[in-house]
Amino acid sequence: MATTETATDREAIASVVQLYIDGASKGDAAKLEEAFHEDARMFGSLGGQRYDVPISALIEEMTSQPLDSDGSFEARITSIEQVGDAATATVEEDGCWGGVSFTDFFTLVKIDGSWKITVKTFAHTGGEMPAA
Protein backbone atom coordinates (compact mmCIF):
# COMPACT_ATOMS: atom_id res chain seq x y z
CA MET A 1 0.00 0.00 0.00
CA ALA A 2 1.46 3.32 -1.06
CA THR A 3 1.68 6.17 1.38
CA THR A 4 2.10 9.86 0.79
CA GLU A 5 3.35 10.57 4.30
CA THR A 6 5.98 13.27 4.53
CA ALA A 7 8.22 14.23 7.44
CA THR A 8 6.66 17.70 7.47
CA ASP A 9 3.12 16.29 7.66
CA ARG A 10 4.13 13.78 10.33
CA GLU A 11 5.64 16.57 12.45
CA ALA A 12 2.52 18.71 11.97
CA ILE A 13 0.25 15.81 12.98
CA ALA A 14 2.37 15.14 16.07
CA SER A 15 2.23 18.85 16.96
CA VAL A 16 -1.57 18.90 16.75
CA VAL A 17 -1.85 15.77 18.91
CA GLN A 18 0.60 17.32 21.38
CA LEU A 19 -1.68 20.38 21.56
CA TYR A 20 -4.44 18.01 22.71
CA ILE A 21 -2.13 16.38 25.29
CA ASP A 22 -0.95 19.73 26.66
CA GLY A 23 -4.43 21.25 26.64
CA ALA A 24 -6.13 18.27 28.28
CA SER A 25 -3.45 17.83 30.93
CA LYS A 26 -3.55 21.46 32.07
CA GLY A 27 -7.12 22.44 31.18
CA ASP A 28 -6.04 24.87 28.47
CA ALA A 29 -9.11 25.56 26.30
CA ALA A 30 -7.13 27.58 23.74
CA LYS A 31 -4.81 24.63 22.98
CA LEU A 32 -7.74 22.22 22.75
CA GLU A 33 -9.65 24.55 20.44
CA GLU A 34 -6.58 24.86 18.23
CA ALA A 35 -6.18 21.07 18.01
CA PHE A 36 -9.78 20.16 17.16
CA HIS A 37 -11.92 20.97 14.14
CA GLU A 38 -14.94 22.96 15.31
CA ASP A 39 -17.30 20.11 14.29
CA ALA A 40 -15.20 17.33 15.88
CA ARG A 41 -16.80 14.66 18.04
CA MET A 42 -15.72 12.36 20.86
CA PHE A 43 -16.82 8.75 21.30
CA GLY A 44 -16.13 6.12 23.96
CA SER A 45 -17.48 4.56 27.13
CA LEU A 46 -16.47 4.90 30.74
CA GLY A 47 -18.05 3.34 33.79
CA GLY A 48 -20.94 2.03 31.73
CA GLN A 49 -21.71 5.45 30.28
CA ARG A 50 -21.44 5.82 26.52
CA TYR A 51 -20.09 9.11 25.17
CA ASP A 52 -21.03 10.56 21.79
CA VAL A 53 -20.60 14.29 22.23
CA PRO A 54 -19.52 17.40 20.35
CA ILE A 55 -15.95 18.41 21.07
CA SER A 56 -17.18 21.47 22.96
CA ALA A 57 -18.31 19.07 25.73
CA LEU A 58 -14.80 17.57 25.93
CA ILE A 59 -13.22 21.02 26.09
CA GLU A 60 -15.62 22.03 28.87
CA GLU A 61 -14.79 18.84 30.80
CA MET A 62 -11.02 19.23 30.36
CA THR A 63 -11.03 22.88 31.45
CA SER A 64 -13.04 22.10 34.59
CA GLN A 65 -11.15 18.86 35.39
CA PRO A 66 -7.67 18.78 33.79
CA LEU A 67 -6.19 15.29 33.39
CA ASP A 68 -3.04 16.14 35.38
CA SER A 69 -4.77 16.72 38.70
CA ASP A 70 -1.85 15.53 40.83
CA GLY A 71 1.28 15.66 38.65
CA SER A 72 1.22 11.95 37.77
CA PHE A 73 -0.17 12.33 34.23
CA GLU A 74 1.90 10.88 31.38
CA ALA A 75 0.97 10.65 27.72
CA ARG A 76 2.82 9.41 24.68
CA ILE A 77 2.02 9.27 21.01
CA THR A 78 2.47 5.62 20.07
CA SER A 79 1.59 5.74 16.39
CA ILE A 80 0.88 8.05 13.50
CA GLU A 81 -0.39 6.84 10.13
CA GLN A 82 -1.04 9.18 7.22
CA VAL A 83 -2.20 8.86 3.64
CA GLY A 84 -2.75 12.09 1.73
CA ASP A 85 -4.92 14.48 3.71
CA ALA A 86 -6.11 11.87 6.24
CA ALA A 87 -4.31 10.55 9.29
CA THR A 88 -4.71 8.62 12.52
CA ALA A 89 -2.77 8.88 15.75
CA THR A 90 -2.84 6.78 18.91
CA VAL A 91 -2.04 8.15 22.36
CA GLU A 92 -1.53 6.16 25.58
CA GLU A 93 -2.45 8.13 28.72
CA ASP A 94 -1.66 7.11 32.32
CA GLY A 95 -2.25 8.94 35.59
CA CYS A 96 -5.36 10.77 34.40
CA TRP A 97 -7.04 12.33 37.44
CA GLY A 98 -4.50 10.53 39.60
CA GLY A 99 -4.74 6.96 38.33
CA VAL A 100 -6.97 6.36 35.32
CA SER A 101 -5.56 5.11 32.00
CA PHE A 102 -6.89 5.54 28.48
CA THR A 103 -5.95 4.75 24.91
CA ASP A 104 -7.09 7.51 22.56
CA PHE A 105 -7.53 7.09 18.82
CA PHE A 106 -7.57 10.33 16.83
CA THR A 107 -8.64 10.86 13.24
CA LEU A 108 -7.17 13.96 11.62
CA VAL A 109 -7.82 15.73 8.34
CA LYS A 110 -5.69 18.32 6.58
CA ILE A 111 -7.95 21.27 5.77
CA ASP A 112 -6.63 24.34 3.96
CA GLY A 113 -3.08 23.23 4.75
CA SER A 114 -3.64 22.67 8.49
CA TRP A 115 -4.14 19.40 10.36
CA LYS A 116 -7.14 19.20 12.70
CA ILE A 117 -8.49 16.42 14.89
CA THR A 118 -11.96 15.50 13.65
CA VAL A 119 -12.72 12.51 15.89
CA LYS A 120 -11.43 11.33 19.27
CA THR A 121 -12.41 7.80 20.30
CA PHE A 122 -11.21 6.62 23.68
CA ALA A 123 -10.95 3.29 25.50
CA HIS A 124 -10.71 3.14 29.30
CA THR A 125 -7.79 0.79 29.94
CA GLY A 126 -7.32 0.93 33.70
CA GLY A 127 -7.93 2.59 37.03
CA GLU A 128 -11.08 3.85 38.67
CA MET A 129 -12.58 7.26 38.19
CA PRO A 130 -12.27 9.42 41.32
CA ALA A 131 -15.46 10.07 43.27
CA ALA A 132 -17.19 13.28 42.28
Summary of predicted features, one role per range:
Residues 36, 44-46, 110:
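Generic secondary-structure microfeatures
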Residues 101-128:
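Short beta-strand edge/turn micro-motifs at domain boundaries
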Residues 8-15, 41-100:
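Surface-exposed, charged secondary-structure patches
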Residues 36, 93-95, 121-122:
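Short beta-strand segments enriched in hydrophobic/aromatic residues
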Residues 1-30, 34-38, 127-132:
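Short, low-complexity N-terminal intrinsically disordered segments enriched in polar/charged residues
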Residues 39, 55-61, 115-116, 128-130:
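Short alpha-helical linear motifs
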